[in-house]
């Protein structure tokens, strides 16, 4: 591991959560930051946070004793010892600047999380995609085995309503983010790497550098621990070969005949997925998931393999996966209105976009699949435009929002206007809407009974599901098609950078 890659982050093990004193989190409402705040609050640590939007997570933080400021002000830092920020916060943010002026301890989210993990056996889940779902599955398997792990997940486990927990057991399960190299500060006992594909090229430049970073991450694994990765993924296979040549403990899973945990008779339907698992020709039994998709089966296999290598009872893994409720924003069913089924999905990289849309096409059956997509990050939309466009074309119809890219500088010609031209769908089956309110109206105009609609992409798009259901219900009730929740028609109100510069209302057809 090069010193350059982690120069601005403090490695794990140098701080404990109690060393941090009173903690303030800038932008506390997002899933990652709110989970961290919840973890500290349940450990009895004083926590405050600042936010500009009333995220659903904030009520829970207040109930735990957190102080939430609905503004960014220097006065928010009074009485604070440590200020925590995420990569979404610009370095010139007034609270960050003031914290440094006052000489307060300033930590990146990953550094604060590393402090919380001190003294525990860390199970870190990394990968280009599938991290949140896999971290959730591993967590539930450990919970079912009775070891009460602590965890911080980049999402909320459905029906649990939280992405963080302070447990009493020795294990701490964490989702490790490669986007800014911050995963290189962790010192895992178990490292799970789901896959390695081109992404975050603004940080790494090319795939070779990204693969090198994942190799560095794997090398940080405790010598008494092990690495788990996917034999069905080309990047992960290359990683496994490299690590084995270095004499490291690495184990693979997948349908490949040379996988250490081999999956056979895998079958997926709209009701879920099942497979048989074996090690060295010895059956470990049948495993079932109530969520569909081959990729979900592969994610779950990493949890089975980790449990097997940790010596945990596999009946716990079988039971946990059979009851897996899913993760919010990962193939999440939002509801039905006017016989149109609405889902929400976090996918924004071309591979998970394609996987999710193929699975949803099975769900749609004879109905059509309509995707409402908000690209996440200008650099990704630019670097992977062709691949994203091809993945979106799996849908029958596309409603495209402007790119969500907080803190990014927009160059001329960048954004969703360029992306929609690249999507190989007929002009009448794709549309770019330049306001948030226009999207539900457009979906209500296009969707027919029996269709499936999915909101997909950047975090703000998760807020649209209820609006779509309201618009479809209003259509059924005979309300004007242009009516949106709140009684407005059209409009150009933006959410979190949805429409740069305050575009005019309405929808403009692609073509």
Swiss-Prot record:
GO terms for molecular function: ATP binding; UDP-N-acetylmuramate-L-alanine ligase activity. It comes from Salinispora arenicola (strain CNS-205). Coiled coil: none annotated. Residues 484-504 have a biased composition (Gly residues). HAMAP family: MurC. This is UDP-N-acetylmuramate--L-alanine ligase. Keywords: ATP-binding, Cell cycle, Cell division, Cell shape, Cell wall biogenesis/degradation, Cytoplasm, Ligase, Nucleotide-binding, Peptidoglycan synthesis. GO terms for cellular component: cytoplasm. Pathway: Cell wall biogenesis; peptidoglycan biosynthesis. Its EC number is 6.3.2.8. Gene3D superfamilies: Mur ligase, C-terminal domain, Mur-like, catalytic domain, NAD(P)-binding Rossmann-like Domain. Belongs to the MurCDEF family. Residues 481-511 are annotated as: Disordered.
């Amino acid at each position: 591991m090069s010193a350059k890659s982690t120069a601005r982050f403090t490695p794990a093990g140098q701080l404990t959560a109690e060393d941090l004193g009173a903690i303030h989190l800038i932008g506390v409402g997002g899933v990652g930051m709110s989970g961290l705040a919840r973890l500290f609050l349940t450990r009895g640590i004083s926590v405050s946070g600042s936010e500009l939007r009333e995220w659903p997570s904030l009520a829970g933080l207040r109930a735990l004793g957190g102080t939430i400021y609905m503004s960014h002000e220097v006065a928010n830092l009074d009485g604070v010892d440590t200020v925590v920020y995420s990569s979404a916060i610009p370095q010139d943010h007034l609270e960050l600047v003031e914290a440094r002026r006052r000489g307060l301890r300033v930590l990146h989210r990953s550094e604060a999380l590393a402090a919380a993990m001190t003294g525990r056996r860390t199970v870190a889940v990394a990968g280009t995609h599938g991290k949140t779902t896999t971290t959730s599955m591993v967590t539930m398997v450990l919970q079912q085995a009775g070891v009460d792990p602590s965890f911080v997940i980049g999402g909320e486990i459905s029906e649990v309503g939280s992405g963080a927990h302070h447990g009493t057991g020795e294990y701490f399960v964490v989702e490790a983010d490669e986007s800014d190299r911050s995963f290189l500060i962790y010192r895992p006992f178990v490292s799970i790497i789901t896959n390695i594909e081109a992404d975050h090229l603004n940080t790494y430049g090319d795939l070779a550098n990204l693969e090198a970073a994942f190799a560095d991450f794997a090398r940080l694994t405790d010598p008494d621990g092990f690495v788990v990765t996917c034999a069905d993924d080309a990047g992960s296979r290359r990683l496994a070969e490299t690590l084995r040549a270095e004499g490291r403990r690495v184990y693979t899973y997948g349908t490949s005949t040379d996988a250490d945990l081999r999956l056979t008779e895998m079958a997926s339907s709209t009701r879920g997925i099942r497979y048989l698992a074996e090690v060295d020709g010895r059956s470990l039994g049948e495993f079932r998931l109530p969520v569909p998709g081959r990729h979900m089966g592969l994610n779950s296999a990493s949890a089975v393999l980790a449990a097997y290598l940790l010596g945990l009872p596999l009946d716990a893994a079988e039971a946990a996966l059979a009851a897996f409720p899913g993760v919010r924003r990962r193939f999440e069913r939002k509801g039905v209105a006017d016989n149109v089924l609405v889902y929400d999905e976090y996918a924004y990289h071309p591979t998970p976009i394609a996987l999710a849309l193929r699975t949803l096409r099975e769900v749609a059956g004879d109905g059509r699949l309509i995707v409402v997509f908000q690209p996440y990050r200008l650099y990704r939309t630019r670097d992977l435009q062709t691949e994203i466009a091809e993945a979106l074309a799996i849908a029958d119809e596309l409603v495209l929002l402007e790119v969500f890219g907080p803190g990014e500088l927009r160059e001329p010609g960048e954004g969703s206007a360029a992306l929609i031209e690249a999507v190989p769908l007929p002009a009448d089956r794709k549309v770019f809407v330049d306001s948030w309110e226009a999207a539900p109206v457009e979906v209500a105009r296009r969707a027919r009974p029996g269709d499936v609609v999915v909101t997909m992409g950047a975090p703000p798009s998760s807020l649209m599901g209820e609006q779509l259901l309201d618009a479809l219900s209003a259509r059924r009730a005979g309300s004007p098609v242009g009516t949106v929740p709140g009684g407005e028609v059209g409009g150009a109100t933006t959410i979190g950078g949805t429409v740069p510069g305050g575009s005019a209302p309405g929808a403009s057809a692609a073509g």
